[in-house]
Amino acid sequence: MFKLTEKGEKIQEMFDTIAPRYDFLNRLLSFGIDRKWRRFAVKQIRYAEGGRILDVATGTGDVALEIAAQTPASISIVGVDFSKEMVELGKEKVNCSPFAARISMQVAPCEAIPFADGSFDSVTIAFGIRNVVDRAQGLKEMHRILKADGRAVILEFSTPRLTLFKALYHFYFLKVLPVIGGLFSQFSAYKYLPDSVMEFPSQEEFKAIMAGVGFKNLKHFDLTGGIATVYVGEK
């Protein structure tokens, strides 16, 4: 059985704690743009009739639900997350949706995905790879569970390149966001968010990590001036 590191356990505990306010704060702090980003990311997936899609770090199921909305009824979706509280909330959302029969969710970390090799047509992870302590291992697992020519789609925060926009972004992300997040939830969690984004690799560096575990045909898309990035790779 995979054991989280001490850092991983702290991150897991943090997400368990903020789970009840997670969706609300996502909408508030991103001004609702996160929904647009997820829609764009899901448009990049690949699947065959009757295929399966895996959403890693599924949280409360936003991406899993978006996948269901964009794909035929023959497609089944599995969501996994290392936070039990997030998964429980996600199950409630899914059960209240029109897609309950197509989506299943379970607790599992990215570094030890509990499915056989070559099980899925595509794998997605949105705003989650940044929180995986052993990113290379997480990416290896995502690569492993893909079918041949399967596609990985990764949505993650990034740092804008334009100087003025970057300055405004840093002010909001480092000064404003933790305060607003702290008013409604846990301050330390929303202090962790910008810190983790600042230390995340650049787009080219991250694509090199993906290539290192076997992904090919790599590309990325900058969204909203580079605030977020979608990475696409194939097995």
From Swiss-Prot:
* Methyltransferase in keyword set: yes
Q: Which Enzyme Commission number(s) are on file for it? A: 2.1.1.163, 2.1.1.201
UniProt pathway annotation: Quinol/quinone metabolism; menaquinone biosynthesis; menaquinol from 1,4-dihydroxy-2-naphthoate: step 2/2; Cofactor biosynthesis; ubiquinone biosynthesis
Molecular functions (GO terms): 2-methoxy-6-polyprenyl-1,4-benzoquinol methyltransferase activity; demethylmenaquinone methyltransferase activity
Q: Which domain of life is it from?
A: Bacteria
Q: For this chain's UniProt record, which GO biological process terms are given?
A: menaquinone biosynthetic process; methylation
**Alphabetic keyword roster:** Menaquinone biosynthesis, Methyltransferase, S-adenosyl-L-methionine, Transferase, Ubiquinone biosynthesis
Annotated residues that bind S-adenosyl-L-methionine are located at: 60, 81
Reaction(s) catalysed (UniProt annotation): a 2-demethylmenaquinol + S-adenosyl-L-methionine = a menaquinol + S-adenosyl-L-homocysteine + H(+); a 2-methoxy-6-(all-trans-polyprenyl)benzene-1,4-diol + S-adenosyl-L-methionine = a 5-methoxy-2-methyl-3-(all-trans-polyprenyl)benzene-1,4-diol + S-adenosyl-L-homocysteine + H(+)
What InterPro entries is this protein classified in?
SAM-dependent_MTases_sf (IPR029063), UbiE/COQ5_MeTrFase (IPR004033), UbiE/COQ5_MeTrFase_CS (IPR023576)
In the record, the note on similarity to other proteins reads: Belongs to the class I-like SAM-binding methyltransferase superfamily. MenG/UbiE family.
Q: Which HAMAP family match?
A: MenG_UbiE_methyltr
Q: What does this protein do?
A: Methyltransferase required for the conversion of demethylmenaquinol (DMKH2) to menaquinol (MKH2) and the conversion of 2-polyprenyl-6-methoxy-1,4-benzoquinol (DDMQH2) to 2-polyprenyl-3-methyl-6-methoxy-1,4-benzoquinol (DMQH2).
Q: What is this protein called?
A: Ubiquinone/menaquinone biosynthesis C-methyltransferase UbiE
